[in-house]
Amino acid sequence: MTKTGSKGGNLRDKLDGNELDLSLSDLNEVPVKELAALPKATVLDLSCNKLSTLPSDFCGLTHLVKLDLSKNKLQQLPADFGRLVNLQHLDLLNNRLVTLPVSFAQLKNLKWLDLKDNPLDPVLAKVAGDCLDEKQCKQCANKVLQHMKAVQADQERERQRRLEVEREAEKKREAKQQAKEAKERELRKREKAEEKERRRKEYDAQKASKREQEKKPKKETNQAPKSKSGSRPRKPPPRKHNRSWAVLKGLLLLLLLCVAGGLVVCRVTGLQQQPLCTSVNAIYDNAVQGLRHHEILQWVLQTDSQQ
């Protein structure tokens, strides 16, 4: 049969005690659901069919004690095949198996195994032996179980080693990340400190500039009166004004000399009888007489004479 359901309805009719014979049934697939409904069928014969694979849920038929899968086209067994922990007898004669799943090591109750006529891996083929009789098949079961346990242990060690490598790599990544984050924090901290210092300097510079600006008007106000009061004495008179005073002084001096000369001539020489000299002498006498009666002049003359 090419479909699992074509004969699924009469599986119970094939059940003989605890044995269910589905050999030579032209099966391409295993009727797992129907088999799961027959937990009494602890002995299952699926030999001489066209099975190339077993579904993963086949491993849920944990009630199986004896299983015949010989003369099919099986290329591999499910990864969870070791779940069939009650299996004691397993016939895999004449299939296309190269290796067995690691979980095979869990079949602790397996007592009989036939792996003849399979393209097994050379190491596994050497362990399995020839399986030519009952004794060799029992030895095959024992040796293959021991071999698969060793393979399982090796794989577990390899898995643990990979996990350790991954953990170490993760630790290194975490340490690297932490170092990177610490470096970034330190960089941010330094940048923040530099920014704070820059702002402080700007603030101090602004305060200093403000103080200078406040001092500058005071200096100007303090210096302004000094410049006004002190500049006048130092300021030289215009040259033109100096020249005028010099000329005026010269003229006055010349006039005084002329007056004095004329006065001397009129009083000493023989010209004193002349009308002009008579007038000059009269003016001089009146002036001297008036000055003598002046109170201030008298006080000055007395003071001078006392000294």
Swiss-Prot record:
Can form homodimers. Interacts with SGO1. Interacts with FGF1. It comes from Rattus norvegicus. GO terms for cellular component: cytoplasm; endoplasmic reticulum membrane; mitochondrial nucleoid; nuclear envelope. This is Leucine-rich repeat-containing protein 59. InterPro entries: Leu-rich_rpt, Leu-rich_rpt_typical-subtyp, LRR_dom_sf, LRR_domain-containing. The chain crosses the membrane at residues 245-265. The keyword Transmembrane applies. It is found in: Microsome membrane; Endoplasmic reticulum membrane; Nucleus envelope. It holds the Pfam family LRR_1. It is a single-pass type II membrane protein.
